[in-house]
Amino acid sequence: MSSKLFQNKLLLAGIGGFMVGGLASWVVSSDAYTAYHRLPASAKHISEISKSPEAVQMIDNIYRERQRSMKMEEHPSLLQSKYPSNFLSFKDGLIPVFKTFYDPEHEEWISIGLMGKALTGYQKLAHGGAIATLLIESLETVRNLRSSQANSQSTQPRDPIPTENFDVRTPSYSINYKKPVPAGDWVIVRVKDDVARLYNSKSQLLAEALDLQS
């Protein structure tokens, strides 16, 4: 009797193992699984960071700051020109700002991004040049968007340094570094009145850039 019971248990274990193996095989061969694992590493990383609790918390902080009365309009990311794409947007570089808002009540542009670990300068801190590039790019893109809207033209961002135009102004900015920016940290960029300010997730001011051409 015990031998028969043992055989039944062995049979059930074999069937269970076969079903588990079949289910795992189906999951691995499914289109969703295959599509995800064929994504480039950068796409997977952006997919993961966009669900980060810290990123969500940063957005919540913005709403709380404005006492939930701010009417924000979502816009395309500020960082779209070739300038940051060539110099900062590479693996572990400046992760593209995936959310950009315009607050019409306070006339302020708000963007959220991630300073990649490849932008490390001194002792695992974000390089000062990368920080300056991010702030200047934000200033120039907002300037371009305002000009385009005023002239009812295309709102495509431009590079910070104009080229092939003899009627150009000389770019001039004042960069002030307030606190170290850890590489790989989330940051908020706020642009208002020709000043771009960089904050961390705790709303601490890290750096700012003033456009001296205005």
Swiss-Prot record:
Keywords: Membrane, Transmembrane, Transmembrane helix. InterPro entries: HotDog_dom_sf, PTE-AB_protein. Residues 147-166 are annotated as: Disordered. It comes from the Eukaryota. The chain crosses the membrane at residues 10-30. One of its GO terms (molecular function) is fatty acyl-CoA hydrolase activity. Residues 147-157 have a biased composition (Polar residues). Its main location: membrane. It is a single-pass membrane protein. It is found in: Membrane. SUPFAM superfamilies: Thioesterase/thiol ester dehydrase-isomerase (SSF54637). GO terms for cellular component: membrane; mitochondrion. The keyword Electron transport does not apply. One of its GO terms (biological process) is acyl-CoA metabolic process. This is Uncharacterized protein C3A12.08. It comes from Schizosaccharomyces pombe (strain 972 / ATCC 24843).
